[in-house]
Amino acid sequence: VPMPPRRASPDAWRRPAAQVSRLDSDAASHRMRARKPMIMPRVVCPSPVSSVDGNQSIGTLTHAGCRNTVVFSSASGGAGTSVFAAMVAWRLAQRKLQCALVDCDFAAGGIDVLLGIENEPGLRFQTVDIPLGKTEGAALNGELPQWERVGVLASQPWNGSDPEPWTVSAVLEALAQANDVVVVDIGAPSALHSLPMLRQCRQVVLAELTVLGLARARAARAMMIRQGESRPIMVGVVPRGL
């Protein structure tokens, strides 16, 4: 007996579209699960007031007048300390914090060349003149060349002698009072021997993620703790050259 023809329901045309939509949704959901999450770099802003026994957040200081100074160094040459310090200063400036970047690597210097502002007018460490051992931070800020809304005080050892320790101390204290954050690049941790005013500042040490780089970083960390300096924050880096 022949079966009577099935009468299509009025909304039968919707079913293929619904199935396609469900398949697209399932495929999109699968792609989202398979996709690795994007991890954005996090920059910790310093707290205006921190205790000596505070946590490991960037900006904790014991040096009076420089509570918002952060010192960057690396036990391995070419690890990108200057670039890392400049990027931290740049990110802080993006967060609407007034930031100064200071080049205290008096053996090599040249952070203004790295940033492409070597021809910009303004102060360099070799041209700072503080005869009375004290200066106004706001006036000093106004004399610094700017890079991405960051005032930069570079060192140019090829254009003069190293500044006197009291000049460095006066500059750092003035900048700390006139800025939210002062980022200091000293090159190597051993530079703290000639920069005693920075020994109790928050230290960030870059460790190159190689066998030799980690051994150097471990020795530098032990030396800093042994000499009574603040326990450093260690940051692992993998330099990528040409």
Annotate the PLM regions:
Residues G80, F106, T135, P163-A170, ...:
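Charged, alpha-helix-enriched surfaces in structured cytosolic catalytic cores
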Residues V70, A100-V102, G151-L153, R202-V205, ...:
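Hydrophobic/aromatic beta-strand patches that form the interior of the parallel beta-sheet core
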Residues V1-V70, E118-A138, C201, A215, ...:
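Acidic-aromatic/histidine active-site loop/patch
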Residues A170-L242:
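Conserved catalytic-core segment of NTP-binding enzymes
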Residues G109-I111, G160, A191-H193:
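Conserved protein kinase catalytic core
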Residues L92-V152:
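Phosphate-binding loop that captures ATP/GTP phosphates
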